[in-house]
């Protein structure tokens, strides 16, 4: 016996078979899916190379650095890398304000677009380099734009990956999205504040399960603010930190939990009122 779960997403259908029977896929279908995956990979690599070329141009017009400083200009992988990078950027920030800002902006968006680790250290660095209001706006904007570009990338070429490797998880999240469809922006904000779903998973599956881009961007822009607040505040004491984990205290965790609950309260009240009047 077969039980089918379906989630219709923009002309595409998720389908899972539960049971002991498994039908062998038709040869034509396998060939078609293989060709689609190869084409998607080719497009993805082309887009990545174009983005990498933009990054190269940005750093080509960066201020001339010494060999020692050039070694420190890299995506931070730990707190020591972040401190070294912060030292170099702070040296040139006042004289080459626009160049440093553009380099920070493009790097952050590049990492977010291609789901490359390291943006947490850039969030911490923003608190070290810039005044708090500018740093918070910059991180929220970069996160919103980078996540939206990742969304668009998934919309263009990521569907075969989602269908092949993440279909079960995507079906479950699709069901959650449908339950929260009337207050979707609150749900996206809640997910961005909390660690229940990885950000990369939210980014690449959202277009497949019909989360509107506008709602996705606004929910991300607002939702990343509370955790970014914590990282930016930690950045003001950058040289006292030894790991990224030290940026998060129990007080900040409690505050994030409270904000997460507040973000979903309007949806809960709306649902209760709707049930009452029905």
Curated annotation (Swiss-Prot):
Compartments where located: Endoplasmic reticulum membrane; Endomembrane system
Catalytic activity: a 1,2-diacyl-sn-glycero-3-phospho-L-serine(in) = a 1,2-diacyl-sn-glycero-3-phospho-L-serine(out); cholesterol(in) = cholesterol(out); a 1,2-diacyl-sn-glycero-3-phosphocholine(in) = a 1,2-diacyl-sn-glycero-3-phosphocholine(out); a 1,2-diacyl-sn-glycero-3-phosphoethanolamine(in) = a 1,2-diacyl-sn-glycero-3-phosphoethanolamine(out)
Transmembrane region(s): 39-59, 96-116, 142-162, 184-204, 212-232, 249-269
Membrane topology: Multi-pass membrane protein
Source organism superkingdom: Eukaryota
Role description: Phospholipid scramblase involved in lipid homeostasis and membrane dynamics processes. Has phospholipid scramblase activity toward cholesterol and phosphatidylserine, as well as phosphatidylethanolamine and phosphatidylcholine. Required for autophagosome formation: participates in early stages of autophagosome biogenesis at the endoplasmic reticulum (ER) membrane by reequilibrating the leaflets of the ER as lipids are extracted by atg2 (atg2a or atg2b) to mediate autophagosome assembly.
Protein name: Transmembrane protein 41B
Organism: Xenopus laevis (African clawed frog)
Gene: tmem41b
């Amino acid at each position: 016996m077969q039980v089918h779960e379906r989630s219709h997403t923009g002309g595409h259908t998720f389908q899972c078979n539960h049971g002991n029977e498994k039908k062998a896929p038709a040869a034509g279908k396998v060939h078609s899916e293989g060709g689609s995956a190869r084409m998607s990979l080719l497009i993805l690599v082309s887009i990545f190379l174009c983005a990498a070329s933009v990054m190269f141009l940005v750093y080509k017009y960066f201020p001339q650095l010494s060999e020692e400083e050039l070694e420190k200009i890299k995506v931070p992988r730990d707190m020591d890398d972040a401190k070294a990078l912060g030292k170099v950027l702070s040296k040139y920030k006042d004289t080459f304000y626009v160049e440093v800002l553009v380099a920070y902006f493009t790097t952050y968006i590049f990492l977010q677009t291609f789901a490359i680790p390291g943006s947490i250290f850039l969030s911490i660095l923003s608190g070290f380099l810039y005044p708090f209001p500018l740093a918070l706006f910059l991180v929220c904007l970069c996160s919103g734009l980078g996540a939206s570009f990742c969304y668009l990338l998934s919309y263009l070429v990521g569907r075969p990956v989602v269908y092949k490797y993440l279909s079960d998880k995507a079906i479950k999240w699709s069901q959650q999205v449908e339950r929260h469809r009337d207050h979707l922006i609150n749900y996206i904000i809640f997910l961005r504040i909390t660690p229940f779903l990885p950000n990369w998973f939210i980014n690449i599956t959202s277009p497949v399960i019909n989360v509107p881009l506008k709602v996705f961007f606004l929910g991300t822009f607002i939702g990343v603010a509370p955790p970014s607040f914590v990282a930016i505040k930690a950045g003001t004491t950058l040289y006292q930190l030894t790991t990224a984990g030290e940026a998060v205290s129990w007080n900040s965790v409690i505050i994030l939990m409270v904000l997460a609950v507040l973000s979903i309260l309007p949806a809960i009240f709306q649902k209760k009122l709707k049930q009452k009047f029905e």
